[in-house]
Swiss-Prot record:
Source organism (scientific name): Phytoplasma mali (strain AT)
The organism's taxonomic lineage, starting at the top: Bacteria, Bacillati, Mycoplasmatota, Mollicutes, Acholeplasmatales
NCBIfam families on file: L28 (TIGR00009)
GO BP annotation list: translation
Record-stated family: Belongs to the bacterial ribosomal protein bL28 family.
Gene: rpmB
Protein name: Large ribosomal subunit protein bL28
RNA-binding is among the record's keywords: no
Length: 62
């Protein structure tokens, strides 16, 4: 299961409810993007980050 490197968001589990309130299991997956960034030592690191975090933090890609 994927997890965001910044916000630690992962998959959510729950129920989808119909009009008659019948419960149907479902999964909400995070919108993870795989990017390469450069760390403090100059090494290239590949991380998974959610689209929301990517938009908010404006990472400089390598």
């Amino acid at each position: 299961m994927g997890r965001c490197y910044i916000s630690q968001k992962s998959t959510l589990f729950g129920n989808k409810r119909s009009h008659s309130m019948n419960a149907i299991k479902r999964i909400w997956k995070t919108n993870l993007q795989s990017i390469r960034i450069e760390d403090e030592n100059g090494k290239i690191k590949k991380i998974k980050i959610s689209a929301r975090s990517l938009k908010k933090l404006n990472f400089k890609r390598v």
